[in-house]
């Protein structure tokens, strides 16, 4: 009516239910521990999900269900939150890195692979969404759109700036960051 778009919000790499029901889908650090980027005592939902695991198909199934329930004609777009590069050394990432001839013992190589894998994930998910809803807007939120995102900008329909006057951002974050958006 007034041209205001309302995208559907969903999270990607944090999900309390998935964390509890599918520990085999969680990202693992070099010591074999689940990756918890927030350091919050349990109970929490901050164990990071590995996008190379069986979760990828689950996520696609969830997106398909959302699109079918909402209806393509009612879907303005999809805002996917909590997507970031992870120094993951789970069996899925190790196998994929080995296939690419990468050194799984090198943190630098693991982070290079993490960037590659996240870009690949965004491409796959964007193609998947657009195969069902060609006009849907797509945004992947990883806290900050910056240089690490540049390889996958083609997968975004637009860019957004997340800036809250709380936490680590504060009131001075938005004016400075918006000059670079």
Ranges and model annotations:
Residues 113-116, 168-172:
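Alpha-helix capping and helix-loop boundary segments enriched in small/acidic/polar residues
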Residues 13-42, 80-105, 156-158:
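Aromatic- and acidic-residue-enriched segments that line the glycan-binding/catalytic groove
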Residues 81, 146-171, 178:
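Aromatic- and acid-rich polysaccharide-binding/catalytic face
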Residues 1-3, 176-181:
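Short, intrinsically disordered, charge-balanced linker/junction segments flanking boundaries
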Residues 3-12, 82, 140-142, 163:
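A cross-domain feature marking catalytic cores of carbohydrate-active enzymes
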Residues 5-7, 76-77, 157-159:
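Hydrophobic beta-strand segments of well-ordered beta-sheets in folded domains
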Residues 5-70, 111, 123:
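Active-site-adjacent "subsite" loops/lids of carbohydrate-active enzymes
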């Amino acid at each position: 009516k007034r041209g205001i778009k309302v995208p559907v919000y969903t999270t990607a790499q944090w999900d309390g239910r998935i964390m509890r029901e599918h520990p085999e889908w969680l990202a693992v650090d070099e010591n074999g521990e689940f990756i918890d980027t927030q350091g919050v005592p349990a109970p929490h939902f901050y164990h990071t999900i590995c996008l190379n695991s069986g979760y990828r198909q689950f996520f696609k199934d969830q997106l398909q269900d959302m699109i079918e329930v909402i209806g393509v004609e009612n879907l303005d777009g999809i805002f996917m939150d909590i997507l970031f590069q992870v120094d993951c050394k789970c069996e899925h990432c190790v196998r994929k890195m080995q296939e690419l001839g990468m050194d799984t013992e090198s943190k630098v190589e693991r982070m290079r692979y993490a960037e590659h894998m996240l870009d690949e994930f965004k491409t796959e998910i964007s193609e998947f969404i657009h195969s069902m809803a060609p006009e849907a807007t797509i945004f992947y939120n990883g806290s900050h759109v910056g240089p690490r995102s540049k390889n996958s900008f083609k997968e975004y329909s637009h860019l957004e700036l997340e800036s809250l006057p709380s936490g680590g951002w504060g009131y001075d974050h938005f004016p400075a960051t918006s000059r670079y958006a």
